[in-house]
Structures are given as C-alpha cells and as structure tokens.
Amino acid sequence: MFMNRLFGKPKQETSTLQTLDKLNETLEMLEKKENVLLKKATGEVEKAKEFSRAKNKRAAIQCLKRKRLYEQQVEQLGNFQLRIHDQMIMLEGAKATTETVDALRTGASAMKAMQKATNIDDVDKTMDEINEQTENMKQIQEALSAPFGANDFDEDELEAELDELEGAELEEQLLQPVPIHVPQGNKPARAPAQKQPTAEEDELAALQAEMAL
C-alpha cells in the first residue's frame, strides 16, 4: 500500500523529501533528549555517592531509583530512534526505486518515439537514395575525367596517318647521299709544325756563340 501511494503522484517527490526532513528533525530531537537524560542519570549517581558517604542510605537509594527511571527513558528513546532510522531507510529506498522507475519509463518513451519517427521502410528508402546519389556522382566524375573531344576522332584514320608518316620518313632516309670513305693511307701527310724556340733556348744559343768567338 505504501509503495502504491508513492508512485504516480506528481508531487510525490517533494512530499517524500519533506517526510525525510521531518523524520530527521525528530531524530535530532530524540538524540538531544537522550543526552539530557544521560546527564541526569549520571548526576543521580553522583548524588547517591554523596549520600552514601554521609551515611544517608535512604536518600542514596532514591537517587539510584531516579537513575533507573532515566535509564529506562533513555532505552525507550533509543527504540524510537531505531524505528525512525528504519522508516528513513525505507523512504530513501522507495525514493530511489521511484526515481529508477521514472528514468526507465522516460527512456522507454523516448525509444518508442524514436521508433515511431524512424521505421525500417524509412531506413531502406534512405539507403536507396544514398546509393542512387553515389552512383550519379560516380558517373559525373567519370564524365569530367574523360579527355575533351576524345570521341571526335576515328582511330583507323589516325593509324593510316601514322603509317604514311613512317613511310615518308623511310623514303627520305633512302634518298640521302652515301658518304665517300677515303682510306687512311692515301691522305696527304701534313708537314710537321716547326717548333718555336723558347727564351731559354735563345739564351743558350747566344752563350754558345760568344764562347765560339
């Protein structure tokens, strides 16, 4: 019943947070009361010691009775705190569960919306369009890369013209005069070039002429 009340309400998250805050405030209040009672119990023990030293047994026993009452209240407050802790843990767990379910529900709704916006037929159609555009682009690129005016010439005519050029070149080579070969031994011998005397040779000749005198 508690989980059913927790789900499906628009302001449930705010209410849960407020409840947790209230429980936390109550827990702090109980802890403060527990500390006060513990101090009172400790004070009764000190009083009992003083009365015991004063040989006032009856007063000392009364102090111990009050100490027992304070301890019972402390134990009761401890049980209250334990229950509040349990309740807070349950609420926090329920809050986490609610947030998880809401997140899953939101994700499922988003997935459902995307599936409605995109189905298998749309995917197939899109892929066909992409393939068609790709093929068209290939044809355009092939047309642009072909040599300009390449289909305007006849291959047979070009080959005939090439044969004609080769025949004319061969005929021109046949009509060129044959060079006359002169034997090496029949060539007229050249007179050896007269060597010009150097400056040292001139000085040597002049010295020899002086010595002859």
Swiss-Prot record:
- What start-end ranges are recorded for coiled-coil regions in this protein? 11-42, 118-176
Q: Where in the cell is it found?
A: Endosome
Give the quaternary structure: Component of the endosomal sorting required for transport complex III (ESCRT-III), composed at least of VPS2, VPS20, VPS24 and VPS32. Interacts with SKD1. Interacts with BRO1/ALIX.
Descriptive protein name: Vacuolar protein sorting-associated protein 32 homolog 1
Q: Which organism is it from?
A: Arabidopsis thaliana (Mouse-ear cress)
Q: Which domain of life is it from?
A: Eukaryota
Chain residue ranges for the region called Disordered:
180-213
- What keywords tag this UniProt record? Coiled coil, Endosome, Protein transport, Transport
